[in-house]
A protein has these predicted regions:
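Eukaryotic partner-binding/assembly regions in large regulatory complexes
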Residues: 1-115
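Low-complexity intrinsically disordered segments
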Residues: 208, 217-225
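Short amphipathic alpha-helical interaction segments
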Residues: 38-46, 186-203
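Short, amphipathic alpha-helical interaction segments positioned at domain boundaries
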Residues: 78-82, 169-186, 203, 222-249
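A short, conserved structural fragment
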Residues: 50-59, 198-213
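Short acidic, hydrophobic short linear motifs in intrinsically disordered regions
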Residues: 26-32, 119-133, 142-146, 151-184
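Minor-groove-contacting beta-hairpin "wing" of winged helix-turn-helix DNA-binding domains
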Residues: 63-67, 214-220
């Protein structure tokens, strides 16, 4: 298909804006937003450039987002980069997967996947979140131990939970972190580890971390992602199975 030069130029302008800002809001860039939403050829060109750059271009509400795919280390974050930002010095894979589990737990506490909006609460206290993490890790580790014991009786050693989550490894990594009730920001403490994750999520525009009140709120950006893209019922039920949450809990 042959595209008009003006459409190509406009699509490049939109894509460059997305590369720089990762989002394009109607109220801030009305002309570019209108071109994307009302001109099919412009939208197709922008999406094509996104595909070449290993990203998806999606619109939720009145905002257009550039979302790097999971394996996009250039526009997104590599495992090594995340480990460096979120975990203590010399962190292992156990520490990295623990950080991802913390984020998953945070999402589940905010979103229940029910109704017209998946959001279930407006905020969570940091202390409550820390208790949730400890509780879910312990429950998961207990289930894994029971499953491994049952499989040992059947001569099937080395089994993990059904979803393949190594809860005992993450539990060990979490227990290796010191507790500090003085508000330490060191990543070698449970409080500092959680603080680093919350600061990272805030920098990505996904949460509002009110440190003086020890409170976490979600942003409209995260709400949109969860409602429109990430948290359909299939994804939600799988996440709840991983965390070991039953229907009547």
């Amino acid at each position: 298909m042959a595209y008009e030069l003006e459409a190509i130029r406009t699509s490049q302008e939109i894509f460059y804006f997305l590369l720089e800002h990762h989002e394009l809001r109607e109220e801030e860039e009305a002309q570019l937003y209108k071109a994307y939403t009302e001109q099919e050829e412009v939208q197709n060109l922008v999406k094509s450039q996104g595909e070449i750059a290993g990203s998806n271009i999606d619109r939720y509400g009145n905002v257009i987002y550039l979302i790097p795919k999971e394996d996009n280390d250039f526009l997104g974050f590599s495992k090594a980069q995340l480990k460096s930002v979120l975990c203590k010095s010399g962190a292992t894979d156990k520490d990295y997967y623990l950080s991802q589990f913390v984020i998953l737990t945070l999402l589940v506490e905010f979103y229940d996947g029910q109704g017209s909006s998946s959001k279930a609460r407006e905020y969570i206290r940091v202390g409550e979140l820390q208790n949730c993490i400890s509780s879910r890790l312990k429950e998961g580790a207990d289930r894994q131990t029971e499953a491994e014991a049952a499989d040992e009786e059947e001569k099937k050693p080395g089994a993990k939970t059904q979803e393949g989550i190594a809860f005992t490894d993450m539990m060990q990594a979490y227990e290796a972190l010191r507790s500090d009730d003085k508000g330490s920001r060191a990543k070698t403490t449970k409080e500092g580890f959680l603080h680093a994750i919350l600061v990272f999520l805030e920098k990505q525009g996904l949460i509002e971390y009110v440190e003086q009140d020890e409170m976490v709120k979600t942003t409209k950006k995260l709400d949109n992602f969860m409602d429109w893209n990430l948290l359909n019922q299939n994804h939600y039920k799988r996440v709840m199975r991983i965390l070991g949450v039953t229907e009547d809990e």
